[in-house]
């Protein structure tokens, strides 16, 4: 029905004949979707009869020492969970190695004791690594826990044989992807003995959220990885054919009269910085202090707040030269905005880098100066005053998330060079960011969610400073066997101005198909209006789009010959511009991947756009009145990697592109990344990535007297990245990362004027030099010492150099020498944070 509504809203009735074909396609798509829904909810009984195992927790009244030995009598009284089943490589057969897991509990914590039997204990891998580094060369044991047993949300506590801790959140919506930015405070110890190795875990109830009930019934599963033979097994069987691991949890029984504790913790910090810029005198100093607060409002809901935060030690961004019409999206690296944000990722309308990001008018300031005025100060970042999160889930499965943050007003300073008069220009007002999420779990790992974001800027509204709001929903429904699913979503964006009409935009999406089993297929529909804009608090690369796609895939999960598993798929898509309604592209993509029994993997992707693409975004016109017709093109991508458990690991990527046009557009890219484990303490990896585009056609800023200008250029990008880590212990490590990015766009002097039919004609007037030679060099060296649970000392050295000019430097050595002659920023910082937990204080006072 939504499809017909969109058709009826076409702005020009005279164009209806033009859209008849499109309308028929929409009707056919709706019919196809209806038929698919019939099959979807009839379902199949395959895989639905999997019986859950049950493990029993035993209450202990004695003290449990976390030493990795399991010598307390209580451990012998607990009933072991055994009979693990292989996940990789032979899914579904008994594990080659015996494993026993016992569970104890008391009023404060859950205790897990696991014995991993191994006839070759001297061959157990024990590489050291940083906390949350889950892919180190070591044997692993982990437990997945879902206190609400909803099949949708849970926590993972993982430990290596070398006692490196990894913890993360897991959800069914991300399949096997997990949020490894979550850091809980828990304890573990491991030992290696003549029979194998032992892991002992203590998980305080303060690290979990669970319902207030006399009898607890939790979802649980245990996993083991034997690294040297790459065998992974689980206690409760997990099939590869559908769903994520959280959909295959067993059950934990026996826990009675356990009360959710008062969860209250403080993490105060102090930090200091020394900074020097080579072409400026003196050394700058600064000192900061603040705290993070965590409060359990109820047994299921937690408030997280950060007051006067300091994110100066986060890893430097991988900056790039951007020749496209789209904004570059950088990953979030600030801990507060990465931890406990699973609910806020719903609907894809929250991009936390907007908070404390670049001021709206940071570039416009230079156009706001008067005669004889120069900009003397123009901050590139907005100051964050505070941020708060409230999140949790009720016993009925309703998840609630509330986020709020306040950023300070930001001012640029301008000075008159003749009179000396100074004035300030506001580049960003005091701003409040808010998000509300409601997420209801349903049967069969299904859910429905509604979300809302709002950005309220203080002061007088204008074209730049306005109030923005986005309301959205999404829903996922699965059949009882989890083989078929359907999802739908939509959003409405609103911008409120004082002196202009409210700007409204909308977005909708629909997907249905067979998403489990060996053969898979689905249909996707997406519609985004030309006015849909969630970017005040979210990130959207581009709007104004309608897309249809159908995907067919076939996967194998059982080994045959030397092949462990395969994945193949065909994707056919058809895309249009929403306004004005017009064809943009059609493509077909073939994808194949295989994993060998020696854990080498290879993938091949082939893409075709047989009719080319009408690109309405490259001309940079707001009204989409012009487009550039990109010629038919072909792309081939190849990837391969070796067994990561070996001392030397290699990853290779290669790509070739060719367009059929008079300009001879073609290009290639490749990357090679060797990783070497010199010892169980020291490892390093190096990556070189090269991309070359020949006779590339792109937009050029020039005098618009002849119209929109395009130019022909060769674009070369070379990126070198070196990373290394020396691990003193599981709580102390030194890391180093250096990255040099060099990109140059070399125009050959051929410039063109864009025509109304998307073609190009030779430009007759001159164009200024458009060449670009851009460099970014960043070095981050970090020493981390986790001196107590949840407490940390970090010492960081950063070096950054940037250069950009219109002179192309041909030689790599000459380019690097020129870069080193530019001003460098060096900083050294020390930060200490200390974890204070109410439960620990309560135990101390209770013992007295």
PLM features: residue spans?
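Bacterial N-terminal signal peptides
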Residues: 29-42
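Structural preference for beta-rich elements and adjacent junctions enriched in aromatics
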Residues: 47-441, 450, 822
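Sec-dependent signal peptide cleavage junction
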Residues: 44-55, 840-848
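Bacterial N-terminal signal peptides that target proteins for export
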Residues: 3-32
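Exposed, low-structure sequence patches enriched in small/polar residues
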Residues: 383-385, 391, 467-468, 481-848
